[in-house]
């Protein structure tokens, strides 16, 4: 349940403090795209209750779960499904963008987490999302790109 209004040329999304859990299964077009599965997982940590996400397209697409749990999420993997218990109070820590989609997941989780998050292997994110730092800072995110010593 997220309040939204769809107009001819825009969508207005209103903030809420309560998000309902959902069940999602990735499918080929026109189903739910597997490429959105990992970013959605970060958002499911905000939902009150248990969300279930089933990956039917690719094996081994849950590398992001290790790092979300490290941030304080409560996610269990069972073969091709994950069970996301929420809401979680995510905390900043060091995580890894294991690929482009996991990187998007880590960015979304970091935006909600308390404290500072360091995302390693950021080249996956920068390669896949044009001007992502500028776009996110323009809406209030604090992001710093630095070289590791």
Residue spans of the language-model regions?
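Short, structured segments at the rim of ligand-binding sites
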Residues: 1-149
